[in-house]
Design a protein with these regions (language model features):
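Carbohydrate-recognition beta-sandwich/jelly-roll modules
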Residues: 1-173
Length: 173
């Protein structure tokens, strides 16, 4: 499917179990794409999302709230199932999810600094979206939910860089 406004075209293509989002523009600088899925949620649930930098003890299941940015991926746990929403690793956009009432929005920020990217007619694959739902057994245990989240994180990465040796490092600016 393709959508357009002016000289900007957004293309959605199903491929390898994901939905590729591409944008093409001749002259218009593109800043952000926002995709919305209508009426995804009904009822209440809890969400677990990532953080932009690193976790400071704040990664936890929380009562869902509207308009909270959840970078890269998030999970929603409700009775009997775990819903998973994410983008595959190494996208060409800064991606974050947002709950807006019953809707889900995905923001794809393709700016260059604070300016829109000037594509000059080129096509940019902004991200590959993956979504799934995991049915949980009647017990609906934390272990089941953890395993669903773990499986989805594996789905987001087609080519993990697993090393034979230990890698040491720090992120202390």
């Amino acid at each position: 499917a393709a959508f357009g406004a002016g000289d900007v075209t957004v293309e959605l293509t199903e491929t390898d179990g994901s939905l590729a989002v591409s944008v093409q523009a001749q002259n218009t600088p593109v800043r952000e794409l926002v995709l919305t899925w209508k009426a995804v949620f009904n009822g209440s649930g809890e969400v677990l999302g990532d953080t932009w930098e690193r976790g400071y003890g704040d990664l936890e299941w929380k009562k869902e709230a509207d308009h909270i940015g959840m970078p890269w991926y998030f999970f929603r746990h409700e009775a009997g199932k775990c819903l998973a929403f994410g983008v595959k690793v190494r996208p060409s956009a800064m991606c974050w999810w947002e709950k807006d009432g019953a809707d889900v929005k995905l923001h794809l920020d393709v700016r260059c600094g604070t300016y829109g990217v000037e594509l000059g007619g080129r096509k940019l694959e902004a991200a590959k979206i993956v979504m799934t739902s995991y049915a949980l057994e009647e017990a609906d245990t934390p272990v089941e939910v953890f395993e669903a989240c773990r499986a989805f994180c594996s789905e987001m990465c087609d080519d993990p860089d697993c090393r034979d040796t230990v890698i040491y490092g720090g992120n202390n600016w």
